[in-house]
């Protein structure tokens, strides 16, 4: 059972998400918060698998709440998905940089929302094409700094390769097909790279891949 905490200041939005999620046998909404501070408090009490976090909320915004949840060692297994009205919301990139595992537009189709919650709970990144473009634009304006490139030092050649492929958006199955190995082998390399880089999930690996220049704008 995947447990979900809803954080949005609009009661109707929360009700809609709850109705959809609770209709699934493997998903259950365990709590609702109308502001960021309440989201942090409930996350600590309920320790859900996934938090669907609106960015713009009173008392404490979703960006700050995401940062606090991600920074809490007791909530290491909690994954935050930020919600926004527009795909290129100015805060989306910052939310991902602060530890969010992914991003959803509020008018996402129900089937996509369900897939997203399950994917993030399984440890996958959730980056839409629009957000990926935003990442590319952000890092296209930067030059690689020695400190950033130095993050790759602990990685083996294979781990660097898998980091680059994750940065390009490939799934474990797709990488396994390319390498002609099992998905389990790929997962081992991904997990080792995450551990060495201190990354919580694949979304963070994507950030590192671009930040270090391992993946460049225009690469496919």
Predicted regions mapped to residue ranges:
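Short hydrophobic/Thr-rich beta-strand motif most characteristic of the beta2 strand and flanking loop
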Residues: 26-34, 42, 199
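Acidic catalytic/metal-coordinating carboxylates
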Residues: 35-38, 59-67
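Recognition helix of helix-turn-helix DNA-binding domains
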Residues: 169-204
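Active-site beta3 strand of CheY-like receiver
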Residues: 46-52
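Basic, Lys/Arg-enriched C-terminal extension of HTH/homeodomain DNA-binding domains
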Residues: 39, 194-220
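The feature encodes the CheY-like receiver
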Residues: 13, 53, 58-59
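Short, flexible helix-to-coil linker/hinge segments that flank and couple to helix-turn-helix
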Residues: 92-97, 102, 106-157, 161, ...
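Active-site residues of response regulator receiver
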Residues: 8, 54, 84
């Amino acid at each position: 059972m995947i447990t979900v905490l809803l954080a949005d200041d609009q009661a109707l939005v929360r009700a809609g998400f709850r109705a959809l999620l609770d209709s699934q046998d493997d998903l259950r909404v365990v709590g609702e918060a109308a502001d960021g501070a309440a989201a942090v408090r409930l996350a600590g009490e309920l320790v859900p698998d996934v938090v669907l976090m609106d960015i713009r909320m009173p008392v404490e915004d979703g960006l700050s709440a995401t940062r606090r949840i991600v920074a809490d060692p007791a909530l290491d297994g909690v994954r935050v998905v930020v919600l926004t009205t527009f795909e290129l919301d100015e805060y989306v990139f910052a939310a991902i940089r602060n530890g969010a595992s992914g991003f959803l537009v509020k008018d996402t189709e129900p089937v996509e929302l369900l897939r997203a919650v399950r994917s993030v709970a399984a440890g996958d990144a959730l980056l839409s094409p629009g957000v990926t473009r935003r990442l590319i634009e952000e890092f296209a304006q930067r030059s690689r700094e020695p400190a950033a490139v130095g993050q790759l030092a602990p990685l083996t050649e294979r781990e660097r390769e898998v980091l680059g492929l994750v940065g390009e958006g490939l799934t474990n199955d797709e990488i396994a097909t390319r390498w002609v190995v099992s998905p389990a082998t790929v997962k081992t390399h991904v997990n080792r790279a995450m551990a060495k880089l201190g990354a919580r999930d694949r979304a963070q690996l994507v950030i590192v891949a671009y930040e270090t220049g391992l993946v460049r704008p225009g690469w496919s």
